[in-house]
């Protein structure tokens, strides 16, 4: 795996509050290697460790993006929903930013069926067929389409399982993480001081509740994906 310079600035991470962990009583002892100190009953994350992990993750994403691989970004907690959609759209990644539907990956055949239903309903709407139906039936189909758009809109173009998943909150996305582990899909995950870093392939110690923190980490990761793809197209 190639190593590059990703302009990861410790002061910028401080300003984004990446270093702020949870209350000390909530900690997971496995996060001890990533904790710098505690202040007012709050654990402070070692940003040097964060920078090292983030750089490693960026190197990996750059390399596999250059090989045309596919990415899935997952973040359904309210702080992350808009950030995930924006970052994933800009980097042309698949994403889930609403409720994770159990079996979305492990029961991929069912997900494919739902995606096909979504595409069929979208086509019917776009061609004006809804307008030709009785109002009650059209309203029912519109509700179905809205639900599918809400939960599957971010993966509507996903035709196979992703090659790697980026997860913004380990505890909130435990089902998604579990499915990735079951299927052997590599994971990059923000891990706060109450998380278990052993559950992911590349843990990035960081505040997983703060909007600025999530945004900074996501921006660095998706920039690496974009750079890898740009190099591939040369």
Curated annotation (Swiss-Prot):
Keyword hit for Chloroplast: yes
One Gene Ontology term of the molecular function aspect: structural constituent of ribosome
UniProt subcellular location: Plastid, Chloroplast
GO biological process, one term: translation
Signal peptide: none
GO cellular component, one term: chloroplast
UniProt key word Transmembrane: no
Entry keyword set: Chloroplast, Plastid, Ribonucleoprotein, Ribosomal protein
Superkingdom per UniProt: Eukaryota
Family recorded in the similarity comment: Belongs to the universal ribosomal protein uS2 family.
Record-linked PANTHER family: 30S RIBOSOMAL PROTEIN S2 PROKARYOTIC AND ORGANELLAR, SMALL RIBOSOMAL SUBUNIT PROTEIN US2M
Name under which the protein is recorded: Small ribosomal subunit protein uS2c
The organism's taxonomic lineage, starting at the top: Eukaryota, Viridiplantae, Streptophyta, Embryophyta, Tracheophyta
Gene that specifies this protein: rps2
